[in-house]
Structure formats: C-alpha cells, structure tokens
Amino acid sequence: MMAGFAQTTITKINQFYERWMPRLPAEMTARNVLVFCVVCLLCIGSVMVASASMPYAEYMHENPFHYVVRHAISIATAAIVAYLVYKVPLNVWFKNTFSFWLITILLLLAVLVIGTEVNGSRRWIRLAGFTLQPTEVAKVMMAIFTADYVVRRAKEVRTHWKGLVRLSGVMAITVGLIIAEPDLGATVVIVLMMVGIFFLAGAPPTQFAIMLGAVVMGIGFLILFEPYRLARAMSFTNPWADPLGTGYQLSNALMAFGRGEWFGTGLGHSVQKLSYLPEAHTDFMLAVLGEEFGFVGISIVIGLSFIMLACCIKIGHRALKHNFLRAGYLAYGISIIFLLQIIVNAGMNMGLMPTKGLTLPFISYGGTSLMMCAAMISLILRIDASTQEINPDREESNF
C-alpha cells in the first residue's frame, strides 16, 4: 500500500511535467532548468555570504572579505569536484559501493580522533587551512550505497527480513559514528534518506513501518536523554521565554524576518547580522536574506530550490522508467537529501523546527557542504545523460 502511494505520487509529478513541458520552449528540459536553478542559487548565495559575513569577518579576522574569498575558493573547488564526478561512469560508483562505504567509515573515525572541536562537536578535519566535514561526504556515499543495495538485494528487500536487517546494520554503524561527534541533524538526513529509498524500492509495509518506527524512537531517545538537545528541541516552541539563553538564535532570526516584511531593508542593511544573530552566514543565512530582501526574496530562493528538487525527481523517474534502477533510486535519494535540508533549514530559521546545523543548499557558507551539493547535482546530470534511452540490459547484482 505504501509503495503504491509513493509510486502514485511520483506518477502525478511526472504527469504534471508531461502536461506542461510541451508548452515550454524545447530548451527548457529538466537538465537545463536544473542547471539554471543551481547557478541562480549560487549567485544569490555568494552575494548573501558577502553581506552576512562582512561584519563578523571584520571583527574576527580584521578582514571583511575573509569569508568572501574562502567562499569563492569553495565554489571553484566545488566546480572541479562536480566536473570530476560527472566524468566518472555511473557503473563505477555502483560497482565499488562497499569500498566507498569503508572510506566513509574511516573518515568518520578519523574525525573522532583528529577532528577539530567547535561548540562541543567534533565534526571537522583541518586540511591545509581548510576544513573537511566527513558527515557531508557520508550523505552522498550512503545514497549511492543504498541505491545499489536495494537493487542488488531486490528480492530480499521485497520479500525477506534479511533485506531490512542487512541495511539496518550498515545504517547503525554509520550513524553511530555520526552521533558520536555528535551531529543529530546529519543523522536524521541520512537515516530518512535510506528509509525513503528502502520504501520506494518496494519494501513490505510491515518492514517499512518497523524501520520508520525504530528511527523515530531512536531520534526521540537521543533528544530526551541529552539535556542540551531537549532544551534546544523545546526552545523553538517559545523562544521568547528565554531570549538570551536557549532561544537566543531563534528570537534574533524571527526579528530579522519581522524587519524584512515584504521587500526587505535592502542589500547590506541587515541589523541582526551585526553580531546579534550567531552563524548568520551559515545556518541562519535565510534569516538575513529575509531581513534584506523580505518575503519576496525568501519566496524566490525557496521557489528555485523546489524547482531544482522537482527536476531531480523528474530525472530519477525517467531513469526508473527506462529500467536504470540504481540510477533512479540514487536520484531519489539525492532528492530526499535536498528536500530535508531545505525543509529543516527553512523551518528552523522560521521557528517551525528545532535548531539544527543543516545548511541551505548552494546558499549557506560551508566548503564541504557546497562541494557535496555540487557533487550530487553532477551525479543527477550524469544520470540524465546516461538514461536517455531504455536500458537494453536487465540490471544484475554486482557480486
């Protein structure tokens, strides 16, 4: 029943495309629209990183362009990463999923040993003046692993408990290391992405319900038995109860939205970014954007993000339709990652969700996040280029 609902939803999205795309110019393919949205978001993000970070950079580094320069380097690096990822054939990714998973585990272990601790979390590895965040790499690698797994073990996934047990074991090892950092936000994204692919691959409703229930219980346990997480989870319901304590970030973010109204105060005229709103150029970039460009600016960014997401889903649906199962599930996994990051980041900025350290794709400052987002878009473009025609071969197990 649940798998049928998922397929019905995807079919509705595809029908929407088939109904409206013929009315648009031939150049407006899902691929071209996707690239257009990403470029627009990158441009908006670059402008907002400059606007939001300059006061903080001047205070911390005595150079207002400190984060602007680093962001420009990150964009250049992300472009190189995207090019290299695009050049790798899809079958190379899928034939080496276990090796990529082991590399991911080693990175997650390394960050616990040699990682840099910031605000009580050990999530970053310093490399030549820059930082690498292994959890961002884990999101992409686990999407590739899960997409391959549900095809390689298709019979087990759909008919036997072994499919659930094997995948749960891999999930437990991976998210266990991420929780140890700790990084609950990345944990939620990875777990829900894996559960989503498992569901779309046709898992029995009972297994899906058990897996989802275990995830919800696990997240609840992590929140309830860690005082700072519980305080953060509860503060979003009424940040004004403790505006100088647990509700400080959110109360300042809400004031930023309030000042922005419909059209904003103008580029560079944000008050909250002047040391009032912590992480203004990273997690709370949307609040600064709302203050400077108002509801209209927020609507444009969210609209572009969801159009980008719809293009990813469209490309994934066509891949499945043409019998490229691994590619299709990977596209859906990437779509789920983007969807969760957009919803959680926007939700926490607007006080609809607890505060979590998740960036807004292509908008927020963050080198590893930007590189991995570029890599995911590159994978989507590779899927689009590789699945234009119906797959003449039935996809088989890798081993």
From Swiss-Prot:
Keywords: Cell cycle, Cell division, Cell inner membrane, Cell membrane, Cell shape, Cell wall biogenesis/degradation, Glycosyltransferase, Membrane, Peptidoglycan synthesis, Transferase, Transmembrane, Transmembrane helix. Its main location: membrane. InterPro entries: Cell_cycle_FtsW-rel_CS, FtsW, FtsW/RodA. GO terms for cellular component: cell division site; plasma membrane. It comes from Acinetobacter baylyi (strain ATCC 33305 / BD413 / ADP1). Residues 54-72, 119-126, 181-183, 229-292, 349-359 are periplasmic. Pathway: Cell wall biogenesis; peptidoglycan biosynthesis. This is Probable peptidoglycan glycosyltransferase FtsW. It comes from the Bacteria. Its EC number is 2.4.99.28. Peptidoglycan polymerase that is essential for cell division. It catalyses: [GlcNAc-(1->4)-Mur2Ac(oyl-L-Ala-gamma-D-Glu-L-Lys-D-Ala-D-Ala)](n)-di-trans,octa-cis-undecaprenyl diphosphate + beta-D-GlcNAc-(1->4)-Mur2Ac(oyl-L-Ala-gamma-D-Glu-L-Lys-D-Ala-D-Ala)-di-trans,octa-cis-undecaprenyl diphosphate = [GlcNAc-(1->4)-Mur2Ac(oyl-L-Ala-gamma-D-Glu-L-Lys-D-Ala-D-Ala)](n+1)-di-trans,octa-cis-undecaprenyl diphosphate + di-trans,octa-cis-undecaprenyl diphosphate + H(+).
